[in-house]
């Protein structure tokens, strides 16, 4: 599943080509993905793209006629093409945003769990207003994390993956961050110390920043808009490495289902207090 670094990578890849352009048309081949594609998108011809941004895992295309919200879902990807070199759409190519300059932003999604939505203002859209702070923002502090964790009996891995607490810390990066902080994924969030919250906040930011620099993580479906894979998978410490030796201590990496998601950890580097 594309997570925050992958969406940020998409944003940085397509923004130089789309910002300031005028939409010629939006071709919708599949009327329903996770939700029905907003009918307003069919009336975007002639709208100027003012800017692009990201909120959590939503890519937002700001136009003079409202905002287009794109979510990649489980298997979605965006590719930049040029109409001067037409490429036939595959059965999984559901949406094309075409500019008057001939640039095509093509959305591919084999599992159709993504979304193309419209809002007058993205920041007021219900799916956006309930989100927690961005993990790379100044509002995501260790003090905030510590206060939010009080009286939370849920496992810390589920806690940091909760978008009401902080957005964008998906399964891969939660496992990696907890390893870097030396925190067992099953530790109850309320048992986090202030020192651990400082460490956890710092490593979440470090892990996500590094993943963005590496272009995200390619495990199966994700590719960058230019077709290249993300390279963060090459430096994963624990995720997907069950039975392999920990790069720090040599202990075998373990895996356990926590909150219906596979979680990876080193039992020695991340001991669970008794």
Swiss-Prot record:
Active site: 2 (schiff-base intermediate with dna), 3 (proton donor), 57 (proton donor), 261 (proton donor)
Binding site for DNA: 92, 111, 152
Record key words, sorted: DNA damage, DNA repair, DNA-binding, Glycosidase, Hydrolase, Lyase, Metal-binding, Multifunctional enzyme, Zinc, Zinc-finger
EC number in record: 3.2.2.23, 4.2.99.18
Cofactor binding note: Binds 1 zinc ion per subunit.
Pfam families hit by this protein: Fapy_DNA_glyco (PF01149), H2TH (PF06831), zf-FPG_IleRS (PF06827)
Cofactor: Zn(2+)
Catalytic activity entry: Hydrolysis of DNA containing ring-opened 7-methylguanine residues, releasing 2,6-diamino-4-hydroxy-5-(N-methyl)formamidopyrimidine; 2'-deoxyribonucleotide-(2'-deoxyribose 5'-phosphate)-2'-deoxyribonucleotide-DNA = a 3'-end 2'-deoxyribonucleotide-(2,3-dehydro-2,3-deoxyribose 5'-phosphate)-DNA + a 5'-end 5'-phospho-2'-deoxyribonucleoside-DNA + H(+)
Gene3D superfamilies from the UniProt entry: 1.10.8.50, MutM-like, N-terminal
SMART domains attached to this UniProt entry: Fapy_DNA_glyco, H2TH
Segments forming a coiled coil: none
A molecular-function term among this protein's GO annotations: 8-oxo-7,8-dihydroguanine DNA N-glycosylase activity
Any GO BP annotation: base-excision repair
SUPFAM superfamilies reported in the protein's UniProt record: Glucocorticoid receptor-like (DNA-binding domain) (SSF57716), N-terminal domain of MutM-like DNA repair proteins (SSF81624), S13-like H2TH domain (SSF46946)
Zinc finger intervals, FPG-type: 237-271
Quaternary data: Monomer.
Job of this protein: Involved in base excision repair of DNA damaged by oxidation or by mutagenic agents. Acts as a DNA glycosylase that recognizes and removes damaged bases. Has a preference for oxidized purines, such as 7,8-dihydro-8-oxoguanine (8-oxoG). Has AP (apurinic/apyrimidinic) lyase activity and introduces nicks in the DNA strand. Cleaves the DNA backbone by beta-delta elimination to generate a single-strand break at the site of the removed base with both 3'- and 5'-phosphates.
Family: Belongs to the FPG family.
Protein's recorded name: Formamidopyrimidine-DNA glycosylase
Species, as recorded: Haemophilus ducreyi (strain 35000HP / ATCC 700724)
Annotated gene: mutM
């Amino acid at each position: 599943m594309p997570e925050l670094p992958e969406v940020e990578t998409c944003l940085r890849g397509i923004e130089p080509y789309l910002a300031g352009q005028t939409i010629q048309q939006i071709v919708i081949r599949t009327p329903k993905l996770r939700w029905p594609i907003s009918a307003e998108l069919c009336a975007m011809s002639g709208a100027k793209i003012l800017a692009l941004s990201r909120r959590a895992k939503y890519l937002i295309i700001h136009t003079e006629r409202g905002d287009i919200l794109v979510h990649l879902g489980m298997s979605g990807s965006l590719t930049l093409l040029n109409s001067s070199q037409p490429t036939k759409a595959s059965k999984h190519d559901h949406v094309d945003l075409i500019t008057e300059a001939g640039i095509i932003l093509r959305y591919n999604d084999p599992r159709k769990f993504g979304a193309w939505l419209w809002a007058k203002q993205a920041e007021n859209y219900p799916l956006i207003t309930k989100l927690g702070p961005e993990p790379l923002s100044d509002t995501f502090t260790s003090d905030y994390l510590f206060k939010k964790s009080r009286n939370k009996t849920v496992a810390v891995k589920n806690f940091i993956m909760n978008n009401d607490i902080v957005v964008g810390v998906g399964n891969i990066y939660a496992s990696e961050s907890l390893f870097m902080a030396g925190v067992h994924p099953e530790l109850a969030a309320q048992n986090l110390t202030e020192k651990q919250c400082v460490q956890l906040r710092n490593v979440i930011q470090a892990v996500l920043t590094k993943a963005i620099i590496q272009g995200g993580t390619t495990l199966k479906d994700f590719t960058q808009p230019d077709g290249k894979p993300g390279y963060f998978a090459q430096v994963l410490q624990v995720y997907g490495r069950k039975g392999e030796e920990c790069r720090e201590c040599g202990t075998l990496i373990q895996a356990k289902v926590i909150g219906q998601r596979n979680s990876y950890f080193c039992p020695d580097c991340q001991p669970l207090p008794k």
